[in-house]
């Protein structure tokens, strides 16, 4: 091969490599429209939605731990409330510091058949929007078991392997040891997590009866069998989020 041919081949290779690299960079840097639309603009409306979400969380906690024995409870959260709360109280109370390193600006989009979770990973030019599509349902044959089916995992517009996410989820559950167990299986090639609440309790004190998705909202319904025992078993997961109930 002549020197001229070699230089031409190298030049073509470099152009192709740069083109592939630029394409991958553009795919990773792509910001999904749903993620952008999920952001609630700052202002009085967002503040009110954040307060509504915080109040609903506090009422949910109170319902679960203070209702009379066997009394039913139910609560509804909209994705606008959740995203407003994540942008306001979640930040002001410094709860965002508990997010894994590199993750910021989480947002949710709730649809009738799935929940879309997205967040920014990294910062500046080296950041990307990671989006996760989840189908969610209560397992009928077992009490207090929620199934999460991971049907989509992207960095920008680029599909990526879910293995690292699965390992991270397993580690988090093992670290906390809060009576929540998780098992995995595959359905139609997609990983499915079976999340068991009060997994170590032979007689659960909290019974989930309904988790229903609709356009822009999620309903949660259940009842508590023994509120006093449940209060002793759980640490308040909302901590500084709680509002005074008096």
Where are these regions (language model features)?
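Extracellular/lumenal and peripheral-membrane lipid-interaction modules
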Residues: 2-246
């Amino acid at each position: 091969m002549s020197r001229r041919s070699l230089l031409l081949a190298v030049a073509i290779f470099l152009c192709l490599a740069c083109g592939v690299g630029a394409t991958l960079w553009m795919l990773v840097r792509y910001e999904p429209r749903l993620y952008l639309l999920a952001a609630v603009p700052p202002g009085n409306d967002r503040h009110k939605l954040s307060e509504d979400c915080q109040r609903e969380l506090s009422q949910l906690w109170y319902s679960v731990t203070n209702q009379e024995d066997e009394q039913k409870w139910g609560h509804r959260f909209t994705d606008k409330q959740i995203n407003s709360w994540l942008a306001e109280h979640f930040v002001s109370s410094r709860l965002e510091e508990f997010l894994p390193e590199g993750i910021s600006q989480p947002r949710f989009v709730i649809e009738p058949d799935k929940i879309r979770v997205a967040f920014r990973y990294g910062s500046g030019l080296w950041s990307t929007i990671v989006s996760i599509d989840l189908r969610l349902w209560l397992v009928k044959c077992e009490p207090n078991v929620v199934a999460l089916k991971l049907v989509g995992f992207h960095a920008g517009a680029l599909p990526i392997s879910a293995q690292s996410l699965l390992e991270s989820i397993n580690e988090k559950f093992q670290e906390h040891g809060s009576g929540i167990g998780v098992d995995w299986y595959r359905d139609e090639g997609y990983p499915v997590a079976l999340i068991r609440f009060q997994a170590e309790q032979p007689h659960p004190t909290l019974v989930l009866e309904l988790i229903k998705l609709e356009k822009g909202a999620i309903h949660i319904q259940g009842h508590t069998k023994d509120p006093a025992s449940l209060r002793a078993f759980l640490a308040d997961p909302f901590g500084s989020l709680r509002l005074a109930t008096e």
